[in-house]
Amino acid sequence: RFTKNNIVEPALRGNIYDCNYKLLVGSVPEYRLCMDFKVIDKDSLARTKAQHYRDSVFLQSVDSIAMGMHAIFPDYTEEYFKERLMKGFNEKKNGWSILPRHMATFIEYQECKKLPLFRERPYKGGFHGDEQMRRKKPYGSLASRTLGSLYRDSDRVAKNGLELAYDSILRGTDGIKHNTKVRNARVDFTDRAAVDGNDLMTTIDVDIQDAAEKAIVAQLKNLDAELGIVIVMEAKTGDVKAIVNMSRDANGN
C-alpha cells in the first residue's frame, strides 16, 4: 500500500553582485520551527504504535527540549518553551509553530535538531522546519532603489528595480518531486529537478555607491534641497558605477 503526493521544489533565486563580486542581494534560508503532535497514518495499528512512541518520548523529554531551546534562543525562557510545547501537545496540533514570531536561521535549526525527540526523522519525532527563502541585502539600503525588491522578502514575485528587470534570469524554474509512502517508510523521488536562477553581476561598485550616497545626503542637508540625483559613469567603458536618487521623506529628513 502506498500514497503519493506531488510537491513543488522551488528554484533558488540568483544573487546580485557588484562589479567586484561583492554580494548586494542574496537568498538566505530561514525556518519556521514546527511540531506535529498527531500521527497521521491510515494503518490504525501503525498509527497507534507511532503515536504512543511520540507521546511518551515527548513527555519524558519536554523539560530537556525547553532547556535546550532556551540555550539556542536566549530571548525566550524555558517556561515559555515548555508552555508552548505542552499547549500543542494537549491540543494534538500538527504544524504547531513553536516560535510564531521568530524565524530560525539555518544554524539555529541545526542546533534544534540535536535535541531529544527533535533529532528523530520528522515522520517519527514530529519536529520539522518549514523553509522559506528570504531576500537579504548585506549593505542595507545602499543602492536599494536600483537593486529593487520583491513584493515580500519571502515571496518570489519581483516588484521593481533590477529584481524586476532581470526577473527571467534570476528566478529559475521550479521542480517537482514526489513524497511517496510505502507502508511505514517515506521516500522522496525527483520527477523534475529545480533549475536555480542565474546570478547577475552589475557594473555598480559598492564603494563608489557608498561615497556617492554620503555625498548627496550631505549636499541635500547643506542646500536644504528636496531632491538630488547622482550618476557616476566610467568614461572609457560607459559602465555605471553608482546611481543615487535621494529625496526628503514626509518628516523632512
Locations of regions flagged by a protein language model:
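Short pre-catalytic segments that frame enzyme active sites
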Residues: 1-8, 26-52, 181-196, 206-253
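Extracytoplasmic
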Residues: 9-12, 19, 26-32, 124, ...
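Generic structural detector for well-ordered beta-strands
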Residues: 201-203
